[in-house]
Amino acid sequence: HFSFTFDEETACQGAPLLIDELKKRNIKDSLCIVGEPTNMKIIDAHKGCYEYTTHFHGLAGHGSQPEKGVNAVEYASKFIQKLMQLREVLKKRKPKNSVFNPPYTTLQIGGISGGIARNVIADRCKVDWELRPVVKEDGIFVNKEIDEFVKKELLPEMQKVYPKSEIRKEV
């Protein structure tokens, strides 16, 4: 018998379904081949994966009067710039003798969406990003730095114009 699973890259939904079906049929496995690009090396460690969506809520308005609104896309871009700065710091924090390639914690932006038209101040924006830590401390470091940046710089700046502005991070 051969069995194959699906959805490895996102939620691994196929593996639990396969396990349930094998149990129901009382089929015991004797071999497992994992289709990862390892060149047949045994892998005994894996980077972590933290996935985030950060939501920015500002104040819409007409594009001809930007001072009367809070542009969520502009604040999201400042947030992304901070993440990119942190990415550079992470490269310098690589542990000695790291077995990973690259040998340091990685951070990347997977998507950004916001606004409804060129002439409308965007009151909403969301940023999807991920962190692949080599060590737990890097995850703690990035979250502390970005949360502090939001709390002490971005949000107060937004709330000067519109007190109901908010920035919310989903994990």
Language-model segments: which ranges?
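Metal-dependent amide/peptide-bond hydrolase catalytic core
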Residues: 53-171
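Acidic/histidine-rich catalytic neighborhood of metal-dependent amide-processing enzymes
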Residues: 1-51
